[in-house]
Amino acid sequence: MSNPFQNIGKNLLYISAAGIASIYVVKTIVKARRDAKFIPKARGNNGEVNEKNYYDNLAQVKPGFPIPKDGGDNIDCSEDHQLVRKSKYEGSGLSAVTRKRGDKLGFLDRRRNE
């Protein structure tokens, strides 16, 4: 009769290595997708508007406005690729950039100046 616990250490090592590797891969993919959503249009597309991927980048989607047809979404329709104000009420940057990191209950996050 063979011992059922003979290879338990080796099996546990394989399972834990596979678990750690899968966690690393999933976290890398999720972080890349999250960062890709908040690329400003001037840096991400260099001013080019593509109809088929308009809703792929959430930073360029404006709720309540139709899909742009002429490629210029700035008020003055300037051709430079700098971040400009969209209107006098809306700033040029993203609010996600200025948000503080961490949660309100994290004591270590409060001490950092980010």
Swiss-Prot record:
Disulfide bonds: none annotated. The lineage of its organism: Eukaryota, Fungi, Dikarya, Ascomycota, Saccharomycotina. It is found in: Mitochondrion outer membrane. It is a single-pass membrane protein. The keyword Transmembrane helix applies. This is Uncharacterized mitochondrial outer membrane protein YDR381C-A. GO terms for biological process: mitochondrial cytochrome c oxidase assembly; mitochondrial respirasome assembly; mitochondrial respiratory chain complex III assembly. One of its GO terms (cellular component) is mitochondrion. The chain crosses the membrane at residues 13-30. Keywords: Membrane, Mitochondrion, Mitochondrion outer membrane, Transmembrane, Transmembrane helix. The keyword Ion transport does not apply.
